[in-house]
Amino acid sequence: MRSDIVKKGIEKAPHRSLFKAMGYTDEELERPLIGVANSKSEIIPGHIHLDKLTEAVKAGIRMAGGTPIEFGAIGVCDGIAMGHTGMKYSLATRELIADSCEAMSKAHSFDGMVFIPNCDKIVPGMLMAAARINIPSIVISGGPMLSLNRDGKQLDLNSLFEAVGSYKAGTMTKEEVDDIEDHACPGCGSCSGMFTANSMNCLTEVLGMGLTGNGTIPAVYAERIRLAKYAGMKIMELVEKDIKPSDILTNEAFENALTVDMALGCSTNSVLHLPAIANELGIEINLDIINEISSRTPNLCKLAPAGKYHIQDLYSAGGVQAVMSELAKKDLLHLDLVTATGKTIRENIQNAKVKDYEIVKSIDTPYSATGGIAVLRGNIAPDGAVVKKSAVAEKMLIHTGPARVFDSEDEAITAIYSGQINKGDVVIIRYEGPKGGPGMREMLSPTSAIAGMGLDSDVALITDGRFSGASRGASIGHVSPEAMEGGPIALVQEGDIVDIDIPAGRINIQVTNEEMVKRKESWKAPKPKITTGYLGRYARLVTSASTGAVLK
């Protein structure tokens, strides 16, 4: 056993004494030691209940003959961090989570790992750690929050962000906003749409690192607790067979994840995180690969924010496996890959089927012939930008309008709420990239303000920052190179005419090459906003969004 290095032989008597100081018995130490990374906290609704799942996981480990050893992991609530300095830390914590889980596992020589995340950066951070550590591992997520029906409308957190915009526009009363506030988030779980957390939980299942149902079983269902027990039992099988993440997370597995990503219409953050996870294994996922997979993958789902359905509806319609079964009908997936279930994907989806074709479209009658995410390139974004095209109003798929330029999210929000943005405008928010932010903040507040004020079908937003999975409209992010590195987005001037053609994959400003060169010659990089502490270090080490914003 890997753990023998901390428990076997006379030389390890001091080590065993320390274990015994915590109550471990000789019998427990003779079994495989399984690290359990519990990210429970009292600041994230998606994590408030993870102590219950952790106990279920540990019960499963014990039932299968192992000894669970729990430790804590950090996590940021993106919703609470949204729209202020706190959001600068969100993406940066992905690396902290990966590093700290690596340190705990390596320092104590665990035989296997169970990772218990749920929300935005915790899921990819733990998957990065699993790939890096490369010992038998499994992920059991906390599950999605339920969406509550209120006055005939399904509510979610995004309903409230947009309600603030509606209130500012004078189309909603304070009492109406208060009512949504009290009911939009009815309990524990990751926010209920196909936002970033649920996107990554679903893709964890597709990658093969989670059990069937990991992405869609609601947080409050007893089935989620049973799944956690099975995950605890399953890790012992993976340890016995020495099935490691590198056996599961192959190039083909990432192609599957991107394919299902496009079919589900996942958050654009998924194409930031999947390359980062793959990078841990020496696998390259670039925007060209993403674009190629999107071009051949039909979009089968329009879940919130793209449509009215939520993750609980996807669960009722057959879950992720049902979507995979549809894709398999057109040979769009690699089916003979090993997964954490101990079975192949082909075996996992053998009995899966769509139970409601209103929620999951047939492969023969998709919402669109191409995927939910599109990659754009042009003289604003020569290295690429991404947009969740499944959440873009049809009239905005092709758009031309004047640039309204802001050098921070805060400036843009002030302008939007004060009525300075008009129909047809293209809002440019720059110096919010991985280095410039630093931390590549999510722009949910400005996109929700635009939507809440009734402008989401008339105004586009382009940024070198990112978007929440809850953002909708012509929200084009991850513009690379970013402004802080002298990317062309730094050269856009107020009033420049911007051409957006999402179907053609193009994004340009109507400015000559000669003028762009002239502007670049006079451009000077602004002073870094933060130079000390973790964010100062992060800004110096982080790479482009086009390669996953990993640290080098």
From Swiss-Prot:
Binding-site residues for Mg(2+), renumbered to this chain: 78, 120-121, 442
MF terms in GO: 2 iron, 2 sulfur cluster binding; dihydroxy-acid dehydratase activity; magnesium ion binding
Cofactor: [2Fe-2S] cluster; Mg(2+)
Keyword terms, alphabetized: 2Fe-2S, Amino-acid biosynthesis, Branched-chain amino acid biosynthesis, Iron, Iron-sulfur, Lyase, Magnesium, Metal-binding
Gene3D superfamilies per record: IlvD/EDD C-terminal domain-like
Subunit text: Homodimer.
UniProt cross-references to PANTHER family, sorted A to Z: D-XYLONATE DEHYDRATASE (PTHR43661), D-XYLONATE DEHYDRATASE YAGF-RELATED (PTHR43661:SF3)
Protein name as it appears in the record: Dihydroxy-acid dehydratase
Organism: Ruminiclostridium cellulolyticum (strain ATCC 35319 / DSM 5812 / JCM 6584 / H10) (Clostridium cellulolyticum)
